[in-house]
Amino acid sequence: MIAVSRRADVTKVSALKKKSTVIVNGDDDVDLTSLMGELYSMGVHRIMVEGGGTLIAGLFEAGLVNEIFTFIGNIIIGGRDAPTCTDGEGFIKDSSFPRLTLQEARRIDDGMLLHWIVENP
């Protein structure tokens, strides 16, 4: 299933429709809150998102994240221009920080998979 905004290239959307279900939602950007409502009405009550920092930030900002999994591996990836978990404006004030409660920690090879519940979605 793929979600695109109304400004998406019509030719590309037509090609996508031949291979997947395409939901057109939002004018310039996909309206994430509306999209989640649409998915819910279609019977989708739980989703897994493997998106980039912009999508993850948008979901947090809209209060649409109720749990998150993070993986801590045995290599360091970083630097000024390295991607982060969330992009966008960021969480500047203490009151806007997403608060997490650790649900589970599981060792996988040389890393740890952490399952968090979001306290204040």
Question: Which residue ranges define each predicted feature?
Answer:
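Enzymes that bind and transform nitrogen-containing heteroaromatic metabolites
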Residues: 1-121
